[in-house]
Amino acid sequence: MMAKTDSQYRYLARQLSSKAVLFTEMIHTNAILHGNQSKFLDHTKEQNPLVLQLGGNNPEALSKVCVLSNEIDYDEINLNLGCPSPKVKSGNFGAALMAQPELVKDCLTAMIENSDKTISVKIRLGINDEDINESLDKFVSMIAETGVNIFYVHARKAILEKLSPKDNREIPPLNYERVRQLKKDFKTLEIIANGGIKDINESKNAFSDLDGIMIGREAYSNPRILGNVDSILYQSNDMNKSLKEITENMFNYFDTLNRKSEIKRGLIHMHGLYSGLKDARKIRVLLSNFNYFKKAKNEIISLLDNQYSEVA
């Protein structure tokens, strides 16, 4: 998610789950090739398993980024074909590319030929007024011809002409049955459900016929949802850290960062950690004032120490 799943958020996520596969923000190839490559690509080994998610429509540019990423420890590279924002549409990448399967094939072929990583795609059920019963199978079949076999499927259409990104996450109806049918039709592909998923345990049972689940906004707005991922989905021990311990770890992590902008982003990412708690608003206010933050750290820890010793 753009402006959400940066390195600071991923550090927070790793306080809650050691097993969940994390994604970078969607990063446009031009930002990497013409910007600060270290800023966009470097990460700590603790963030793995980690997927680099790219946006773009130029096979040559995508291949160059793949070559760069060969030197960096990513587990997978994902081409985003599902983002519906106006900026993405005007730049002809994201969900807009679902209308151009031949170009997508060229992009993916270039990525596969120049990468030593697994290549995957993130898609929607379709765009605008497409008939998802016909167009989706055709699109997936064409993409699979490149050798890509991992599809993260947001179980909604993307309406590119009329709806905002927020509305595109809410107004087009969820159609999980279409995702299930996709798996039945393409048994050899890995089909991972995305969209509207808010409960790990329920989702494990509801999507047992698929190859996995992908959680986006809910994992950002309520990071504590990740606290039981390891035991429920990976049959491993949960990290079982208290909110106090997680908060202290984040504060110690911020002390290692050199740029104020990184710390500010990290503080914002922490807001959802306290959702539903009695003192959530007070804690968010304390986190929001960067100039006061260092003085407020002990007050925040005290609030958590006194009232919230339960496991996250």
Residue ranges, per PLM feature:
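Glycine-rich, positively charged N-terminal anion/phosphate-binding segment
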Residues: 1-75
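Alpha/beta catalytic cores of nucleotide-metabolism and tRNA/nucleoside-modifying enzymes
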Residues: 2-3, 8, 106-109, 114-116, ...
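Short glycine-/acidic-enriched loop or helix-start segments at secondary-structure transitions
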Residues: 7-8, 33, 64, 88, ...
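Alpha/beta enzyme core
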Residues: 15, 63-77, 81-93, 102-189, ...
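Hydrophobic faces of well-ordered beta-strands that scaffold small-molecule active sites
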Residues: 22-24, 50-54, 77, 119-123, ...
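Short, hinge-like loop/turn segments at secondary-structure boundaries
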Residues: 38-43, 95-97, 137-139, 168-170, ...
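Short, basic/glycine-rich phosphate-binding loops at helix/coil junctions
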Residues: 44-46, 87-88, 159, 281
